[in-house]
Amino acid sequence: MRSEPAYATEPLPLLGEIVAGRPGAVEGRAEACVPVSFDVLEIQRNARCFVLKVKGDSMIGAHIVDGDLVVLELRPPHDGAIVAALIDGEATLKRYVVRNGRPFLKAENPRYPELVPAQELVIQGVLRAVVRKAGA
């Protein structure tokens, strides 16, 4: 019987929940730490990452569901990236899209509208991985 290689884990801060639906508030301080293997997730060890728990169903088309944990990295987004963003002061998890030089946020569920910032769009992190409990 072969044993699988052991991967070291590192604790990442769980900063609260993020709405995958209509934008809402997000916590700013760590509630706990989540052990994550940078090797398994293919994330560089020096990456500045954090974890949020998903609440809502606006990203089901991207296979991100209510209760999932998302690992996000602090870095600039590229067109098409899934991001945690503050749009006009409220946090949400959406796809970052640039059209005609203007960024907006797009849900991966047709029940939700595109979000065009009236004033401000601040990217808080770019999705690196989704973690789901088995059987969820």
Predicted ranges, named:
Residues 70-71, 84:
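Hydrophobic beta-strand signal
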Residues 52, 83-85, 105:
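Well-ordered beta-strand positions enriched in small/hydrophobic/aromatic, beta-favoring residues
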